[in-house]
Amino acid sequence: MMSQQDLPTLFYSGKSNSAVPIISESELQTITAEPWLEISKKGLQLEGLNFDRQGQLFLLDVFEGNIFKVNPETKEIKRPFVSHKANPAAIKIHKDGRLFICYLGDFKSTGGIFAATENGDNIQDIIEDLSTEYCIDDMVFDSKGGFYFTDFRGYSTNPLGGVYYVTPDFKTVTPIIQNISVANGIALSTDEKVLWVTETTANRLHRIALEDDGVTIQPFGATIPYYFTGHEGPDSCCIDSDDNLYVAMYGQGRVLVFNKRGYPIGQILIPSRDEGHMLRSTHPQFIPGTNQLIICSNDIEMDGGSMLYTVNGFAKGHKSYQFQ
């Protein structure tokens, strides 16, 4: 009889020695991001990276509602205003310069979208929380000035979320896909024929091929090309000019990159992720006219700060609606 001391034994080594081990994607091209700017020494839930026509970076802090403005050249950080709505989650910029801010409200039924100037003035309700039940996490404009948004409701066994399209006059809301679990990140391909959506609590990536009207799904056009692993799941995303998709992995301290067909082709790691630091990676975004990618993350669980990191992506960022 073999003694317990002589039995085969599992040890924490190699990949299993990480707080957030990478197994299925370990053979992908992998790079580690460099620190770019510390937003705060406090752990803030940073989100919503977006650049305006002048190249200024806007982002926000979900739980405290701070709207930040960063000058990429001087690294000066300003706080032009604080959201009057609870739990803002994304900033997108209209061609007219206004900030469109998605907010989650009570995370159940009081989310919406409001527009404001970069100083927080001239507030206009776009999707009003009092007349809808959406919990809006993110949005993306098309070239006509309409937009798609994600409904962040539900959980893994109660999929209440979905994706909707709002016409350029902001008067008509059309469902695109429904019955998904916490719809989160959203991106539109360069030709506006493919909509990408991340489903956080089900760990799935949706690829939705659209007809010319932008709301009808092509026959067999709604597919799930990728299932993620680990806790927590896919978050916000963006595309580059080659139609590659960059998906931040919340709770994992990394960004996964997919080609236009949904195959993983690379990943970007946040420093110290193996030790459990800076795992709350939420949003990648390109500096306009370059292939330089900015990624936000924070270290709330480890009592650390809030950072922006940077790498070069595969291609230059897509020239989105606010630059057209």
UniProtKB/Swiss-Prot annotation:
A molecular function GO annotation: metal ion binding
Top-level taxonomic group: Bacteria
Cellular localization per UniProt: Cytoplasm
Binding site for Ca(2+) 1: E47, D137, N184, D235, S236
Keywords noted in UniProt: Calcium, Cytoplasm, Hydrolase, Metal-binding
EC number(s) reported in the record: 3.1.1.-
Cofactor(s) required, per the database record: Ca(2+)
Keyword Metal-binding found: yes
Cystines in this chain: none
Predominant location: cytoplasm
Annotated Ca(2+) 2 binding sites: S109, G111, D129, T132, Y134
InterPro entries, per database record: 6-blade_b-propeller_TolB-like, SGL, SMP-30/CGR1_Lactonase
Known function: Exhibits lactonase activity. Acts in cells with perturbed membrane integrity and is possibly related to the membrane homeostasis.
Name of the featured protein: Lactonase drp35
Gene: drp35
